[in-house]
Amino acid sequence: KGITVFDLLNIATGKKLNKKEACTILSKVGLCALEYVDREINDSLSGGELKRIEIATVIARNPKMAIFDEPEAGIDLWSFQNLTEVFKDLEMESQGITLVISHQERILQIADQIVLLEQGKLKKVGSKKEMLKLILQEPRCCQRKELEHE
């Protein structure tokens, strides 16, 4: 038998959870059915389910700061919508900071602040409203530069 979602949550927290505690953590990412607790981490889980389980392992630790690097990668649009709801809920109940790194414009809907980087350097920081206004007024400030082929 392989590693289960329950095993993974116990490893993530560093303590022995009971199944009710594990289910409570999973419910925070939209996996509230008790069936997920005993599921094996294998091909039977969708990409969206795996992403939410991955996020649940972070939430389970109750961090002061959580960093998610391109959490939307490899998931479909429906799973993406669920993922944005998870981040909105996480923001409302968390006392810490959640940093989401993404190249996808659609992730902007969950942002409080937006940081623009260019070639690894800080270009601009501002509120979502301020930065979206900048992007709309000066779209070239945020365009991806295509590599020139010789």
Regions found by a protein language model. Name each.
Residues 109-116:
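Conserved catalytic segment of ABC-fold P-loop ATPases
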Residues 54-55:
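Hydrophobic anchor residue at the start of the ABC signature
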Residues 2-18:
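Q-loop/switch helix immediately C-terminal to the Walker
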Residues 86-100, 108:
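Conserved catalytic loops of ABC-family nucleotide-binding domains
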Residues 70-71:
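Walker B catalytic motif
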